[in-house]
Amino acid sequence: MAHIDINLISNTMGRSVDFTLILPSRPYNIENYDAKTDKYYQDKKDKLYPLIILLHGYLNDEKAWTRYARAELFAEENKIAICMVSGENKFYFNQEAKTTKDNFYDFIEYELKDYLYGTFPISPKREDNYIAGLSMGGFGAIYHGFSNPKAYKAIGAFSPAYTSMIEDGIDAQTIVRNCKDAPFCYLACGSNDFLLNDSNDLVNDLKYIKADYYYDFVEGYGHEWRFWDLELEKFIKSLKRTDPYK
């Protein structure tokens, strides 16, 4: 497994952007032994990994999912690449900035993906791409997934900010309600989470557009990392994968 910290000079952002990529190890098998060279060779060496773009919450950064949760372990166990990008506190959508370009949507959807697909053994196919996040990152996953449904097979939203952000001019609800052919949405929230109403509003909107979704409502949890760690693993296990590493 590789843990790669990358600082990329971004044209869409007008500055360098930090992100972390977890790339699982190639599977080895005792049957993959070449007696002539006395070496084991990698199974599926020409196959591409599926990808989860995993977004952090407010006040965190691209390291949060590896500091407070087991993102590396889940990536390795499930043979799935995970990319975590710094969204600062900007909610992952394009917005005006005085001295820089805060084009977070364009960066993720175009520049970041183009770099990942062109540099690493990662599949660009829709059926192999997923996006997920917690809180602010849950908003980002919803915003990206429903804005660009042809790019993602599934969305994971853990304790997402949603309707509570509308009064601040941050609106994903309109995008969800107008989405056609929405990806599968895995939604999770704890009973003690202060954003519980946001999750309930999202459920109503998913029903309104007749989207395929699963809502994991769990008693006893608040807005906390123990919950998000559990839900990330559940989300990965729920994916209906078709890639060679499933």
Task: Describe the role of every protein-language-model region.
Residues M1-K246:
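Non-catalytic cap/lid and distal C-terminal segments of serine-dependent acyl enzymes
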